[in-house]
Amino acid sequence: MEKLDKTASILSDIQMQLEELNTWKNGLVHTFNSLSKQIDDIKWHLEIDDIAEWKKIRFTGPPPSEYSYNIIKDMGGPFSAKPEPQDHVIIYAYTFYPKNLDGDKKYPLMVLVHGGIHGDFESSNADVVRNLIQQGYIVIAPEYRGSIGYGAVFYHLIDYGGLEIDDTHTARDWMLENCPQVDLERIGIMGYSHGGLHTLLNIFRYPKDYTAAYAGVPVSDLVSRLSYRWKGSPTDMGRNYGGKSPRDDIDEYRRRSPAWNAHKLEIPLLIHTNTNDRDVPVIEVESLITHLKAAGKEFEYKIYQEIPGGHTFERLDTPIAREARLEAYRFLAKYLKPENPP
């Protein structure tokens, strides 16, 4: 019996040490991500300074969701006992302006949304930003809650398809309030993958606030997506989605899914997808397309056939990628009318 007690004590000590190591490891990951973000911010100068003025700004988004708050409350997060209206989350964003900005002119605004469940706006997006600046856009790229590079608390504030969508919309509002050169009648939004989900949910929830939109390989249907993408437990499944699995709260997953909100489309929209996309399979985007058609909505889409690169095919340095981006730019330019359309 004494031997069993000693073994149990040793196992308990090992378990505690493993938990401490895991906490330490996670802390190192966020420290590394923060350093990587600072290094990448320096790279932006090399990529964009010849044609644009840019600045990283901060604004406030909505308070954390109750589920997110319960995760961060023991992490030393700057919040009171429960989320209150005054406990706004601080959001970062990148702003880009043409170098020769004319203070007496009006310019179209592009809200450019990064992808990734936990991603960030990296300098790898410089080609798209350059293209937009050359056409005559002002650009804002929000680092919505859950983005990496801002520490563990911000990482765990993620609210997939929920408050993060409001963060992106608030970035749009910030630019209107702080840049008088932005034309209120010419506001576009675009993004790839999870950025495509942001694009779609923004125009569905705030249809009067945007003029035209482009969604590339967009996450479109969380209900079907998790049925074939997720291999963890229902508890793990809900970690990024408000704490519940689809079978616990199917209506909430539909609320956060573009396909189930397609009837709200009111502005011009272009969608691209690729038949060999393994991240957002074409069947998921086809669900969105089917819902839009069933609702009698006018929109444009293109299903690319087996293009190398799969999910990232439009963001590569290949002729077909440049062609796809050009198609998106031309579509948006019809409605946003930049000074130098492609």
Language-model segments: residues:
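Active-site-proximal cap/loop segments of hydrolase catalytic domains
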Residues: 144-342
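Cap/lid segment of the alpha/beta-hydrolase catalytic domain
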Residues: 51-185, 190-192, 227-228, 309
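Generic alpha-helical hydrophobic packing signal
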Residues: 3, 10-11, 25, 32, ...
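N-terminal targeting or regulatory segments adjacent to alpha/beta-hydrolase or S9 domains
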Residues: 1-63, 342
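Short beta-alpha junctions and helix-cap segments that line functional grooves
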Residues: 43, 124-128, 199-200, 316
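Generic detector of short, locally flexible boundary/turn motifs and exposed helical patches
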Residues: 19-25, 33-37, 73-78, 153, ...
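Intrinsically disordered, low-complexity regions enriched for glutamine and histidine
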Residues: 13-15, 112, 270, 309
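Short, flexible coil/linker elements and helix-boundary hinge sites characteristic
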Residues: 47, 76, 136, 296, ...
